[in-house]
Amino acid sequence: MGEAEKFHYIYSCDLDINVQLKIGSLEGKREQKSYKAVLEDPMLKFSGLYQETCSDLYVTCQVFAEGKPLALPVRTSYKPFSTRWNWNEWLKLPVKYPDLPRNAQVALTIWDVYGPGRAVPVGGTTVSLFGKYGMFRQGMHDLKVWPNVEADGSEPTRTPGRTSSTLSEDQMSRLAKLTKAHRQGHMVKVDWLDRLTFREIEMINESEKRSSNFMYLMVEFRCVKCDDKEYGIVYYEKDGDESSPILTSFELVKVPDPQMSMENLVESKHHKLARSLRSGPSDHDLKPNATTRDQLNIIVSYPPTKQLTYEEQDLVWKFRYYLTNQEKALTKFLKCVNWDLPQEAKQALELLGKWKPMDVEDSLELLSSHYTNPTVRRYAVARLRQADDEDLLMYLLQLVQALKYENFDDIKNGLEPTKKDSQASVSESLSSSGVSSADIDSSQIITNPLPPVASPPPASKSKEVSDGENLEQDLCTFLISRACKNSTLANYLYWYVIVECEDQDTQQRDPKTHEMYLNVMRRFSQALLKGDKSVRVMRSLLAAQQTFVDRLVHLMKAVQRESGNRKKKNERLQALLGDNEKMNLSDVELIPLPLEPQVKIRGIIPETATLFKSALMPAQLFFKTEDGGKYPVIFKHGDDLRQDQLILQIISLMDKLLRKENLDLKLTPYKVLATSTKHGFMQFIQSVPVAEVLDTEGSIQNFFRKYAPSETGPNGISAEVMDTYVKSCAGYCVITYILGVGDRHLDNLLLTKTGKLFHIDFGYILGRDPKPLPPPMKLNKEMVEGMGGTQSEQYQEFRKQCYTAFLHLRRYSNLILNLFSLMVDANIPDIALEPDKTVKKVQDKFRLDLSDEEAVHYMQSLIDESVHALFAAVVEQIHKFAQYWRK
């Protein structure tokens, strides 16, 4: 008999340890009571059943035999829940294996709070500890929860956890038995097939649970292992035939805690004593010892999302004077402050001015919703003033979102009283964006183009601050002030704010925020109007841009209304563009292109305009530039580009950060600008989808050999082109992994003749993917073969570039996390789904818990998993067939 066919077991009477049971998760929905029940018992409104999030349930566990309890019940520790109930906690029962009778069963009751000092059962379930053959249960079990009753420990029980009363439960029971047989070695184990099978079983179980009217509690029983061998626990009782007396049980008395959820007076007193003014002089000269210093360094290195414990907060406060020389420690110190205590807040603000100035990138954290003190926020703005315009432009999208956390009254008070004689010069520049005249005072928005005066001022990179500026500026004043000095900043600030003003969702859901953005636009318009001649030119050019975009939107609507096929729509598009009397788009006065204001355009070339083959039919347009050249763009109407705009901004930022570390990965961060929630511009890059390359040329290497041949290069390809391809593959693999970009297929991977590979279409981010079981990164067999295969030097270089890029970006993780934290309230689809988890999703991809060496090994495993992902290859073929039949 082989080793695998042997059955290893141990008698229950010989296992002198306590029984342990793991409480996993609770699946299913709780039904709310009827209105009649609420009227009869008003306390129901204050129960966990009516909380917006998952109520704070707890589970009690007690062992019974013959209807009598064998020990006192144990319960799970307190744990708050947000979206699902998941305790994931091992309970040590006060009974040992030798003390268990053959008919022992465990009763599990789920409880919810019901007013002060009261609890009601959510449901109960009971399961025997030994199976029908006397084997102690092992592994995970899904137990049916009987609603609104306590678990019944009698025999037979009224709350059985293992039943097969329905067809779906028969299916779950059958799969559980098969899983058990596999675990016990009764089936042949095939690793790759087992992984797919267990995932499918898990999906079936989840589906059956959702379709059921019951809730299910997942529990896990301990497995016994010795020398890597799994042992079954068989019931056996020495001298079992001899009779023995049974102890009588007493009624258990539950003692409610009246102080639960109330203020802990001891902790409050300790907090006030630790932060009192008397401790200030003594704390001033405190120096930590080596152990405490290491602990402080660990706290300072925490990511922005890390919540400090009370002990850590007290430690940071105690050594606050020592930490004033560490700029990275400031945000951690401010998290320790209780701003509701005036004396403590006063101490913190006094120390803020003495702290070593923090980096500009770190100051973004102080503009998030977690920091509401106006002095702290203005300190962050003061640090932002040290950033040059180029850096400020990289954060501008997030800074516009950070206005949501400013004091709205301060923004409104910054408006100047309007004069009647200025009303004649205003226009309805926002009318096409969906903002009605009732919402906007027409004298306070961007005006019609003024007579041309002089060219706008060039972009400035100066860090100096003029003497006339107020050092106590709020964020709104700061952004407007800087925008008035830089035409590029003014351009993007205008369009970012316009989109927020036009957002109908914000207008309906949060009218105060909508009104705030309108006030920002009014203040911006006033500031431009008050400026000198060059600043007023900026204002007129912005109005001209708005007029140009309005006409373009009107044109696209007319084309979409045109009946017929794409050819007829193309003809209609070109005809309308050529009609200067109706549209006036082909020949306009020189204006900056909203997408890239450094490019000055004179109009659109009608004969080159065309529509793409897609549902929304975006238009490819060629703009005539100031120097007589062409600038190709894609104008999309009917699509919200804000998500693409965010991802391309982050990719552009990452490219800049990597270049700062002397790592050029040949990325292609093309420009995207949403001019509304329904339309916007995208830069057009001449390229070919990888799917088309494979169809026409057979392989990526054939494509390169066709356009960049070389007798001396690798595989007959120019060495420069191959190097560009390898680096761009590495860059986008790492970046799309960090951002959780989904729906990756060969049609949204594009390739240029110079070897640059880049991604488009970012409709799924932060881990969302319409395809099942997606690989961690898009790296398929065809892409690897384009490098020469897994044994080639180019592939090894690709892996090295991935490791290097990942390590560099990890060092800038705080900046990236701060930028995402400012976007949590933006109406971006994949962020709006779970805004509270957005930053955590990105942080998890960085694996900040690993050392650099461990991070390299982790990236190695991700690459290997992606290259050998079998299911992803199957999905790619399905997508290919779908595209074929669509055509």
Swiss-Prot record:
Post-translational modification: Ubiquitinated via 'Lys-29'- and 'Lys-48'-linked ubiquitination by UBE3C, promoting its degradation. Deubiquitination by ZRANB1/TRABID promotes its stabilization, leading to autophagosome maturation.
E.C. number: 2.7.1.137
Biased composition (Pro residues): 449-459
Modification sites for Phosphoserine: 165, 244, 261, 282
Region (Disordered): 149-170, 416-467
SMART domains: PI3K_C2 (SM00142), PI3Ka (SM00145), PI3Kc (SM00146)
GO molecular function, one term: 1-phosphatidylinositol-3-kinase activity
Name the record gives this protein: Phosphatidylinositol 3-kinase catalytic subunit type 3
Organism, as annotated: Rattus norvegicus (Rat)
Lineage: Eukaryota, Metazoa, Chordata, Craniata, Vertebrata
